[in-house]
Amino acid sequence: MDKRITLIGSKIAKTGNEFIYCGVLEECSECRFKKICHDGLIVGKRYRIVSVRSAKHPCIAYGDGVKVIEVEPSNNFTILIESKKALEGLTLSHSDIQCNNILCKYYNLCHSEGMPEKYKIMELHEKIKCPKGNSLIKATVSTIN
């Protein structure tokens, strides 16, 4: 695994949480922790927190401070896919479900950020009752390198 040490806001520094790295903020330019926060992370990539250290450090961007965490690239994602494409072991090219209902409780699963271009369906879960009538299934998928 490609594990890295970085910093993240104390409130979201929990083992198992995932985040998408969005790049260096303007507030970070003069910070003494800039290098540890940003070096080695790839913009747009999703990371999973594998451990959290107890020490808390001050941060201008995160008013509640930051904690040191160990992260690894997240290779498994839970998303919604069209039922007609739902077959375990199948390799697919990613495309979001066509829907603009941002208030839908499934929106983030239909429009999952940080998704790889291609993935393999690892496990199928329950059928989803889509408010727009789309035939969808929740699935765990894995990145294909």
Curated annotation (Swiss-Prot):
Superkingdom of this protein's organism: Archaea
InterPro entries tied to this protein: UPF0179
HAMAP family per UniProt: UPF0179 (MF_00498)
Family statement: Belongs to the UPF0179 family.
PANTHER family per record: UPF0179 PROTEIN MJ1627
Name of this protein: UPF0179 protein Maeo_1037
UniProt source species: Methanococcus aeolicus (strain ATCC BAA-1280 / DSM 17508 / OCM 812 / Nankai-3)
